[in-house]
Regions:
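C-terminal motif of bacterial Sec signal peptides marking the signal peptidase cleavage site
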Residues: 17-20
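Ligand-binding clefts/hinges and TM-proximal coupling segments of bilobed small-molecule sensing domains
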Residues: 23-27, 151-170, 206-211, 238-258
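Flexible hinge/capping segments at coil-to-helix
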Residues: 28-30, 127-144, 231
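Extracytoplasmic small-molecule ligand-binding "clamshell" domains
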Residues: 31-101, 243
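Short loop->beta-strand "edge-of-pocket" segments that line small-molecule binding or catalytic clefts
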Residues: 37-41, 137-152
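Periplasmic-binding protein-like
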Residues: 43, 120-127, 194, 198, ...
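Acidic, polar ligand-binding/catalytic clefts
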Residues: 75-138, 208-213
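A ligand-binding cleft/hinge motif common to bilobed small-molecule-binding domains
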Residues: 102-110, 155-159, 183-184, 188-215
Length: 258
């Protein structure tokens, strides 16, 4: 059973002030807040979230989530699942929030709420060294892999339709599988988040080029529709931006400057 504590709203900004369990709400207007926040992620998206050799989930999003939880005075519990199941987990109240390098697209906003954006990467097409793939036109007639349920899957479909580039699309469960498909020659390229791609490019000696089309939305924290947590998390993100803490996390985890 999850224990409950109360928090006060002060100065128009929600700040969690944990009180003794069972204490009644004050007259200043309080809302119940879980003492344990259940967070969903998909740990196949380094440097945002992945498992280290010890099996622990680490990454930019994990440090960010832990910082947010500390600021709100709550414990964080992380559940690892497939990326394409994260929205459903929010809708079914299995988790309270999701940090998974998730872009705040209009389609997703119909089903969940988002915080303010905390990072924007852009996309890249990754291929084997010496592939000669340098432009969208070079992808004509080839097979391009994407991670299932991601904005890159949506973006690749848009490129096929809007840029009139005819390539076959192959959706896989995670970014690691995409790289294995490239190395084995089963796909010609993978369309990936730029920050994720840069790590694989360095590790595997791969080639890549930037997607020149319209930039995708930035990454944000996702919540169930109507969640009271949105304002609280936005307040923490604003403080992190102001204090430079967000830049510190980017310097620690992200290869490119943001």
């Amino acid at each position: 059973m999850i224990m409950k504590k109360s928090y006060l709203l002060a100065g128009g900004v929600a700040a969690l002030l944990l009180t003794a369990c069972g204490q009644e709400d004050t007259a200043t207007g309080a809302a119940e807040q879980k003492e344990v926040l259940e967070m969903g992620t998909s740990a196949e998206f380094a440097p945002f979230e992945s498992r280290n050799p010890q099996g622990d989930i680490v990454g930019f999003d994990i440090d960010l989530a832990n910082y947010i939880a500390d600021e709100l005075g709550v414990e964080l519990k992380i559940t690892d699942m497939k990326f394409d199941g994260l929205i459903g987990a929010l809708q079914n109240d299995r988790v309270d929030l999701v940090l998974a390098g998730m872009s705040a697209t209009d389609a997703r906003k119909e089903n969940v709420d988002f915080s303010t954006e905390y990072n924007h990467s852009g996309e890249m097409f990754v291929s084997q060294k010496g592939s000669g793939l340098e432009t969208l036109e070079d992808l004509e007639g080839l097979t391009v892999g994407v991670q299932l349920g991601t904005i890159q899957e949506e973006g690749a479909k848009s490129i096929i339709e809007e840029e009139a580039i005819d390539f076959e699309l192959k959706a896989l469960d995670d970014s690691g599988a995409l790289i294995q498909e490239i190395l084995s020659g089963r796909i010609d390229a993978a369309y990936m988040d730029k920050q994720v791609a840069l790590g694989y490019i360095e590790a595997q000696g791969l080639d890549a080029f930037d997607d020149p089309t319209t930039a995708s939305p930035g990454m944000a924290v996702a919540f169930p529709k109507g969640s009271d947590l949105v304002d609280d998390v936005n307040a923490v993100l604003a403080e992190m931006e102001e204090s430079g803490k967000l830049d510190e996390l980017k310097d620690k985890w992200l290869t490119d400057e943001q």
